[in-house]
């Protein structure tokens, strides 16, 4: 209902059911929200949220952003948006990271074993997109951080991290993986790392779109240890800055 109300208030927004997720005792649609303000727009942006069902701030941020488009469509007159506000409806309903089959949807964009990843690829897999980003949360983090994929320039991500810090929110310093680590809230993921993840069959949605469909791709992460409204504020700050930077 929330999505329908926002979409109904703007003639340029459209809500589509792109497929149905079906499990024993559970069925739900996957929604795609499109904003097409005029023919011949300069930019096309894709963003997704809710691929992990226990990370609610991203899905809420996507809905709030859809509302913002409906209120001020003229602000985005040169931008076409494709938005997947909730990629894992079963996980969201049950507050669980995975889908009912136990698949991490955000590691399934190499093998496409899950219903959800298959539906998203079949609908949005062609691209290209000027920019793509995905909204997530981290139960182990203590602060905000952001991934950028195969992008040498840190100017934008530094600005986003600084804006988050200026709002009084913590910035993550200690996320360490096998080959990646956080440096003042930023994780640089090189292209060779994405190719490696493809070979291991563990591509995230952002890995997939960076490899095949967009030159500018980001993942926003907020710590679930903080209050929900704070996480939502951090997500929205990052989303607004990403969109503004690539639509100037």
What are these regions (language model features)?
Residues 3-248:
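Structured catalytic-domain cores with a bias toward divalent-metal coordination
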């Amino acid at each position: 209902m929330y999505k329908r109300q926002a979409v109904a208030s703007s003639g340029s927004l459209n809500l589509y059911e792109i497929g149905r997720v079906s499990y024993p005792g559970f069925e739900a649609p996957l929604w795609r929200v499109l904003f097409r303000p005029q023919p011949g727009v300069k930019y096309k942006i894709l963003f997704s949220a809710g691929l992990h069902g226990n990370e609610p701030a991203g899905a809420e941020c996507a809905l709030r952003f859809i509302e913002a488009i409906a209120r001020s469509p003229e602000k985005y007159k040169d931008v076409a948006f494709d938005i997947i506000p909730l990629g894992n409806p079963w996980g969201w309903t049950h507050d669980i990271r995975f889908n009912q089959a136990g698949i991490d949807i955000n590691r399934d964009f190499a093998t496409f074993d899950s219903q959800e990843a298959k539906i998203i690829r079949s609908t949005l897999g062609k691209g290209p997109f000027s920019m793509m980003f995905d909204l997530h949360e981290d139960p182990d983090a203590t602060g905000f951080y952001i991934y950028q994929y195969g992008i040498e320039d840190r100017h934008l991500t530094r600005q986003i991290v600084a804006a988050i810090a200026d709002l009084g929110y913590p910035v993550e310093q200690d996320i360490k993986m096998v080959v990646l680590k956080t440096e003042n809230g930023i994780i640089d993921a090189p292209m060779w790392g994405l190719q490696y993840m493809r070979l291991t069959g563990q591509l995230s949605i952002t890995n997939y779109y960076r490899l095949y469909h967009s030159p500018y791709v980001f993942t926003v992460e907020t710590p679930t240890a903080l209050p929900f409204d704070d996480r939502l504020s951090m997500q929205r700050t990052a989303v607004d800055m990403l969109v503004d930077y690539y639509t100037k």
